[in-house]
């Protein structure tokens, strides 16, 4: 829950001086990105802006305290202030901030600005006491805020110090309105008005001006003069003499003499006890003082001018002026040191009763009351955990003695889950083992349910570490003993069980487990696990060959992300990536590329290494289009990320796929052979991850002419794929088997493998997997179509594949580009005619298109030149090749390709 007083604009106090000269300056606030009120304590910063804000409608106010240095807390309150200002216009940003579902503060602000782009009219956000922020992450985010905020949004910042936000840059660009100490200091007229409102005996104008000059217009000093002059044997002049030359750091003695010592003992005790609260209401005052009339006492202090003011329109919440609050806390520590822990204990109880556990924790920590801290955690820790209050929980667990932690095993479990959630995976088992050992030493019983909770977490750690056998045993044991009430651990154990089946290739068992995980996670609002379960379901369906069902499952995942505002989580990139994979398989290349690019956008706030698989997808899109240069650029980026980084084998496999295809297309056997020597060769191929790695190996073996080795690999892959019903892998494997048989002159077996692959594609929808095989595939498909050897569906798919090969590849890309031509002209067997009369680059392109079966008009359209120009090119290249007819040119091109090892 958010404390209302932190989001309420201060009520305009009675008897305050209206600062007309400053309000005139503030009338132009909307013309600036930032209005900065920067001066020491006690000059009326908050009062001035409260006066100005009284006439503003669309304004949010955020009053900071020391606890706001936590980025998550800062973000939640800032967005809440905007929500109050806009009447709930930014609901998505609010949900994201409350659930901490954002990659960084800057990413959250970017989402906020998207929603505010649809807001019409001026909008204002006041952040009071920004000097309390010392967290660099917040400063960096606010620099982003100032650079990108909408034109109609003005930030008003109140601070005792100059905030490190690039203020100079705003000043140069005339985007800063700045008011400092000189402007806020009271002038003679304002000082006269001030004393007229507060003194029973008016001061002469000359006396008032003199007092103002002696304290240099410092509003707090003027207030203290007025307060002191009410005391017997005191005068405004005597107070001014004492205050002259003082500043906020030297006020303690004066405040003791002129304020605390002048009130009765009950009022003094009341003030000191209340000082432990950062904000207060009647219920909290009753807890701390035992007085039933807390609200009346606060109102009476306000009337006396004792530096207390209302924080909201309802008058329920009060706070002390920051200067006075600091002074009172110091005096409380001095005068009530023995009572202070008891006061914080009472404050914690008060906040707990109001439903604010985070504030209660602040006081429990201040009291050093580990027993109370433990009780708060036992009651609220998992709620805080599920709201991602990880930093606060860590602070609490550090404060608890370890003996107290192990006496409450659920807190030891929480400590381990905290490490898991903060990606400190290596610490989780160590923490659990230490806790179990300590409990055994102290003879603290570990019942079956607690053991099952530990096992569920250990199972998650094991599957993350690539230990499926260990994970399966732990998850199975956990599910035996976990009651339905322990839903979170049951969700974890069920998810791990499904993932283990997935890794073992037991897809028919994995899918229902992941569907069950999704249902439980949705029921208990564990939406991260619901999304993970949908992603796993999609991957399982892809492996089974049901790509359309996978696509529809992905739609459900996109809906969940939208409904629960999960757009900034890395799992969103995972979803976009597997969507890209499906679209690529179907040769919807533009959409596949768009999905991969969106995935990279999601990861902009994370480590660049996480972009590896999306970059690999972009490389595959370029390869399917026949754009080798672009593909190579993405491949180089992938290689740069892989250099010096540690990746899971699945990631390496996916990154290597475009590399091996690129080497095949360009004939780079040296790079291929070097890769093969270093490539990891898994012991099994029982799932689609491992099948993919062995397929990469087999492709390189075929390219290097190591046909026997490749055949052994492919036979085992196909056997496993059939046994485990890995339909998509079987579809891909058969295409490689086809290439192997074709290159070893086993045309009948090649045809059989191709026909089965086309048949499987009726289920998978594969197109691009055929297209990337290029001319070898095109030749075979032409033959099958001419022989009319295919059923209707397969015939239609073959024609579509052939069309894509002709459209995207054009066979200039691998065979007739500049690299190929350079290699050809230096080949010892190149025909002398070509060596002495080489074709131009354009003529090589035309030859490639002729070889691909393009007509003259199609070639003209492809190269965007006139048909007569194409005829000239054809005539020239016929002459240079020594041929007279198109078929002769095709045969000559075929011989050149064979000579270079491409066909």
From Swiss-Prot:
Transmembrane portions of the chain: none
Record entry for activity regulation: Activated by ATP and maltotriose, which are both required for DNA binding.
Keywords carried by this UniProt record: Activator, ATP-binding, Carbohydrate metabolism, DNA-binding, Nucleotide-binding, Transcription, Transcription regulation
Limits of the HTH luxR-type domain: 832-897
Domain of life of the native organism: Bacteria
Gene Ontology biological-process entries: positive regulation of carbohydrate metabolic process; positive regulation of DNA-templated transcription
UniProt key word DNA-binding: yes
Feature: DNA-binding region: 856-875
GO MF annotations in UniProt: ATP binding; DNA binding; DNA-binding transcription factor activity
Disulphide connectivity of cysteines: none
SMART domains with a match to the protein in the record: HTH_LUXR
UniProt: ATP binding residues: 39-46
Any Pfam family matching the protein: TPR_MalT
Keyword Iron (UniProt): no
Similarity field: Belongs to the MalT family.
Function according to Swiss-Prot or TrEMBL: Positively regulates the transcription of the maltose regulon whose gene products are responsible for uptake and catabolism of malto-oligosaccharides. Specifically binds to the promoter region of its target genes, recognizing a short DNA motif called the MalT box.
NCBIfam families assigned to the protein according to its UniProt record, in alphabetical order: PRK04841.1
Subunit record text: Monomer in solution. Oligomerizes to an active state in the presence of the positive effectors ATP and maltotriose.
Descriptive protein name: HTH-type transcriptional regulator MalT
Organism: Yersinia enterocolitica serotype O:8 / biotype 1B (strain NCTC 13174 / 8081)
UniProt lineage: Bacteria, Pseudomonadati, Pseudomonadota, Gammaproteobacteria, Enterobacterales
Gene: malT
């Amino acid at each position: 829950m958010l404390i209302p007083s932190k989001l309420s604009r201060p009520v305009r106090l009675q008897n305050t001086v209206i600062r007309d000269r400053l309000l005139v300056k503030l009338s132009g606030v909307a013309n600036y990105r930032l209005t900065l009120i920067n001066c020491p304590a006690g000059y009326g910063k908050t009062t001035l802006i409260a006066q100005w804000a009284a006439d503003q409608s669309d304004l949010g106010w955020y009053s900071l305290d020391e606890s706001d240095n936590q980025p998550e807390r800062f973000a939640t309150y800032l967005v809440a202030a905007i929500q109050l200002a806009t009447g709930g216009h930014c609901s998505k940003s609010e949900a994201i901030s409350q659930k901490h579902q954002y990659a960084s503060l800057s990413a959250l602000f970017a989402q906020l600005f998207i929603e505010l782009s649809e807001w019409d009219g001026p909008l204002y956000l006041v952040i009071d006491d920004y000097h309390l922020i010392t967290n660099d992450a917040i400063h960096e985010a606010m620099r982003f805020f100032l650079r990108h905020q909408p034109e109609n949004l003005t930030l008003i910042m109140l601070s005792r110090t100059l905030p490190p936000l690039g203020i100079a840059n705003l000043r140069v660009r005339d985007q800063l309105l700045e008011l400092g100490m000189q402007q806020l200091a009271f002038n003679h007229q304002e000082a006269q008005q001030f004393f007229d409102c507060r003194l029973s005996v008016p001061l002469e104008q000359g006396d008032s001006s003199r007092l103002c000059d002696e304290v240099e217009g410092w509003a707090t000093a003027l207030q203290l003069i007025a307060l002191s002059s009410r005391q017997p044997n005191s005068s405004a002049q005597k107070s001014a003499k004492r205050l002259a030359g003082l500043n906020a750091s030297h006020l303690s003695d004066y405040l003791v003499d002129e304020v605390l010592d002048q009130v009765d003992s009950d009022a003094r005790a009341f003030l000191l006890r209340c000082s432990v609260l950062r904000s207060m209401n009647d219920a909290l005052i009753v807890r701390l003082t035992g007085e039933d009339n807390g609200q009346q006492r606060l109102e009476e202090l306000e009337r006396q001018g004792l530096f207390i003011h209302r924080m909201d329109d309802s008058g329920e919440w009060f706070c002390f002026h920051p200067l006075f609050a600091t002074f009172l806390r110091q005096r409380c520590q001095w005068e009530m040191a023995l009572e202070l822990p008891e006061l914080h204990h009472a404050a914690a109880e008060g906040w707990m009763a109001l439903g604010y556990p985070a504030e209660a924790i602040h006081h429990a920590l201040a009291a050093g009351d580990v027993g109370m801290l433990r009780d708060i955690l036992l009651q609220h820790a998992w709620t805080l955990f599920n709201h991602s209050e990880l930093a606060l929980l860590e602070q609490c667990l550090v404060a608890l003695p370890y003996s107290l932690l192990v006496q409450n095993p659920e807190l030891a479990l929480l400590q381990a889950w905290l490490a898991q959630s903060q990606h400190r995976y290596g610490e989780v088992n160590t923490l659990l083992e230490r806790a179990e050992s300590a409990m055994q030493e102290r003879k603290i019983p570990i019942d079956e349910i607690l053991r099952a909770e530990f096992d569920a977490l250990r199972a998650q750690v094991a599957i993350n570490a690539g230990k499926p056998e260990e994970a399966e045993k732990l998850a199975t044991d956990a599910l035996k003993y976990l009651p339905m009430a322990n839903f979170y651990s049951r969700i974890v154990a069920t998810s791990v069980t499904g993932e283990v089946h997935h890794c073992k290739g037991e897809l028919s068992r994995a899918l229902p487990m992941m569907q069950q995980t999704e249902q439980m996670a949705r029921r208990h609002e564990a939406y991260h696990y619901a999304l993970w379960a949908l992603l796993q379901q999609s991957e399982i369906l892809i492996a089974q060959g049901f790509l359309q069902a996978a696509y529809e499952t992905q739609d459900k995942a996109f809906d969940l992300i939208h409904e629960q505002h999960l757009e900034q989580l890395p799992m969103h990139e995972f979803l976009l990536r597997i969507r890209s994979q499906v679209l690529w398989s179907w040769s919807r290349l533009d959409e596949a590329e768009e999905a991969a690019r969106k995935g990279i956008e999601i990861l902009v706030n994370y480590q660049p290494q996480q972009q590896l698989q999306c970059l690999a997808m972009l490389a595959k899109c370029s390869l399917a289009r026949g754009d080798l240069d672009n593909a190579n650029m993405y491949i180089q980026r992938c290689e740069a990320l892989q250099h010096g980084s540690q990746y899971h084998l699945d990631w390496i496999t996916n990154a290597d796929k475009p590399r091996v295809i690129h080497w095949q297309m360009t004939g780079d056997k040296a790079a291929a052979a070097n890769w093969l020597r270093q490539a990891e060769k898994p012991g099994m191929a029982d799932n689609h991850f491992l099948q993919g790695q062995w397929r990469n190996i087999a492709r390189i073996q075929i390219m290097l002419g190591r046909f026997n080795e490749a055949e052994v690999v492919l036979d085992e892959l196909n056997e496993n794929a059939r046994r485990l019903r890995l339909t998509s892998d079987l579809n891909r494997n058969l295409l490689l088997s086809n290439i192997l048989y074709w290159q070893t002159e086993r045309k009948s077996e090649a045809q059989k493998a191709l026909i089965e692959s086309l048949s499987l594609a009726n289920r998978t929808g594969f197109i691009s997997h055929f297209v990337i095989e290029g001319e070898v595939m095109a030749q075979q498909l032409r033959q099958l179509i001419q022989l009319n050897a295919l059923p209707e569906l397969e015939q239609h798919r073959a024609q579509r594949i052939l069309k894509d090969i002709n459209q995207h590849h054009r066979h200039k890309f691998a065979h007739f580009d500049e690299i190929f031509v350079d290699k050809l002209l230096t080949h010892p067997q190149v025909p002398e005619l070509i060596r002495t009369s080489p074709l131009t680059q354009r003529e090589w392109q035309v030859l490639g298109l002729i070889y691909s079966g393009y007509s003259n008009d199609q070639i003209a359209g492809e190269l965007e030149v006139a048909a007569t120009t194409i005829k000239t090119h054809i005539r020239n290249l016929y002459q240079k090749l020594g041929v007279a007819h198109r078929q002769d040119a095709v045969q000559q091109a075929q011989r050149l390709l064979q000579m270079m090892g491409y066909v």
